[in-house]
Amino acid sequence: VDYWESNYESKGDYIPRADLGGPEAFKKGVAAVHARGGKIILYLEAFIVTRKNPVGLEHPDWAMMDENGSFYTYYGRDRFYLMYPGEGSGWTEYVCGLAEKMVRDYGVDGFHLDSYGCQWDWKDYNPKHPGATDPAKFNKGAVDLVKTMRERIRKVNPDAVVILECCERTELLDVCDGGQLDAAAWLYSPIKVLNEKPWVKEKKY
């Protein structure tokens, strides 16, 4: 069930749907799952927002641009912004604050950050983001985003977790609670895909 306003593709503010009872019903649903011994891990986009979502409308200045000064598209579609996590952008503060608020207000147990385990080496040409053409700036910002989110939600709930979709970068794995193989891996051989990761032989995780 898509439980955010206004639909699945509206990524950015994550407001529980009014026709399903709104925030209060969502909170009660989480409590009911907890009463049965379950946990609620929310899907959250840390990389993209919908351009027509209130967050996208208000803060295109947080998004990354290509070398021609145009906003990056996402798989060829221009309905999303790709958000920059470094200096000059308020994205990290916003999304980490949002995660903290959802743990506090709804009692959720953590977040699954879609695709964030493989977002790496982006070059950003947005002039509002100093030095962002250096991919190292994005990389540091991505690590800081995951680390900050985990620290903030654990101040509210010490057992809260941050899980990443994809598990390509040890720098990101070092600051989260777990990684999920990318969805495509399940179409053929998850074990083969896992064993191809450069860090598997180190037996670090």
PLM feature segments, named:
Residues 1-2, 41-45, 112-114, 163-165:
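A cross-family glycoside hydrolase active-site/sugar-binding cleft signature
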Residues 4-7, 46-50, 117, 166-170:
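Active-site-proximal loop/turn and secondary-structure-junction residues that shape catalytic pockets
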